[in-house]
């Protein structure tokens, strides 16, 4: 439901509202991918004309969790920087807030790089990030990678120091689960659905000044490095989002809703 709060032309917002409402108010049941989304939808039942009789339930997204042998078998792809790096993964939209990571890099050790993977981008936001990279003279430390393959993405996740997700608008956050499944430390914005996914194994950006972000990353990496059990704690958290649990959730929902 991001379109309700995003800075969109009013004509487009009305068009989206009509489209979403026409789907929701004819449904016999609705599945949300997080408790955050369910709460948001419950708050807008009247707006979407959803009957009070229509059940709204939650089935978290799930992934195929890698086995131990698969993790150790992920090789270092040539696309991976030849330096320790932090990773951010997602579309380059203003709501994802990746631009906050660029000035923060100035307050981190020079040997640490930043990799931004994106599948698509708003041209003005991509230009904004590129200008910031030039402004802070970080051309050699920030890597923008568009539309990487699944093999490349797996390698970039496996060899990163940590995953960073400073977004202020998430319905779920699959990259967080993908990183946890590999035992990688995760740094999240305490907003929307992200705390629901990261739980108590994540580190959170409570403040987003460059110095505060860098401080959170440094203290989190230090704590992670000094706690060998943290890797297994992250993997255990990821197991809550196994695709089999997701499938079972949908199966149960269909049994409750459909006359089968």
For the regions a language model picked out, list residue spans one by one.
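Carbohydrate transferase catalytic cores enriched for Leloir-type hexosyltransferases
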Residues: 1-260
């Amino acid at each position: 439901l991001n379109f309700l709060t995003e800075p969109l032309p009013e004509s487009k917002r009305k068009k989206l509202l009509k489209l979403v409402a026409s789907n929701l108010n004819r449904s016999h049941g609705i599945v949300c991918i997080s408790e955050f989304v369910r709460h948001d939808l419950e708050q807008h039942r009247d707006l979407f004309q959803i009957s009070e009789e229509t059940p709204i339930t939650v089935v978290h997204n799930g992934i195929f969790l890698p086995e131990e042998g698969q993790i150790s078998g992920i090789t270092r792809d040539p696309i991976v920087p030849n330096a320790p790096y932090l990773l951010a993964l997602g579309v380059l939209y203003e709501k994802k807030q990746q631009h906050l990571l660029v000035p923060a890099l100035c307050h981190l050790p020079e040997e640490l790089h930043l990799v931004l993977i994106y599948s698509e981008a708003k041209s003005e936001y991509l230009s904004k990030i590129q200008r910031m990279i030039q402004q802070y003279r970080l051309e050699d430390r920030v890597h923008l990678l568009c539309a990487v393959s699944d093999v490349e993405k797996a390698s970039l996740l496996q060899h990163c120091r940590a995953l960073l997700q400073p977004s202020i608008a998430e319905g779920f956050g699959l990259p967080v689960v993908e990183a946890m499944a590999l035992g990688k430390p995760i740094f999240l914005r305490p907003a929307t659905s992200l705390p629901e996914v990261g739980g108590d194994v994540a580190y959170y950006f409570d403040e987003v000044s460059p110095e505060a972000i860098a401080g959170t990353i440094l203290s989190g990496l230090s704590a992670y490095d000094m706690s060998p059990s943290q890797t297994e704690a992250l993997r255990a958290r990821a197991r809550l989002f196994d695709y089999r649990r997701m499938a079972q959730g949908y199966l149960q929902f269909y049994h409750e809703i459909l006359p089968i």
